[in-house]
């Protein structure tokens, strides 16, 4: 089984760049406090890195 990471949205997407809003939706995050589990792949890591100021990551 592939390694997974937990991603939690900690800040609002209101007023953010459209690309960053799209990245949050791509990760499956919709609201503050929402947590999702995703596979730990370079693509997901890149998305998390782009919106790192709005999310918290747990290994």
Swiss-Prot record:
Cross-referenced PANTHER family, in alphabetical order? LARGE RIBOSOMAL SUBUNIT PROTEIN UL30M, MITOCHONDRIAL RIBOSOMAL PROTEIN L30
- SUPFAM superfamilies reported for this sequence: Ribosomal protein L30p/L7e (SSF55129)
Output the superkingdom of the source species: Bacteria
Gene3D superfamilies hit by this protein: Ribosomal protein L30, ferredoxin-like fold domain
Q: One of this protein's GO BP terms? A: translation
Record's protein name:
Large ribosomal subunit protein uL30
- To which protein family does this belong? Belongs to the universal ribosomal protein uL30 family.
Q: What CDD domains does the record point to? A: Ribosomal_L30
**Recorded GO MF terms:** structural constituent of ribosome
What interactions and quaternary structure are annotated?
Part of the 50S ribosomal subunit.
């Amino acid at each position: 089984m592939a390694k997974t990471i937990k991603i939690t949205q900690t800040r609002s997407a209101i007023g953010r760049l459209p690309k960053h809003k799209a990245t949050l939706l791509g990760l499956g995050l919709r609201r503050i406090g929402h947590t999702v589990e995703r596979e730990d792949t370079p693509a997901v890591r890149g998305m998390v890195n782009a919106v790192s100021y709005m999310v918290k990551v747990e290994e």
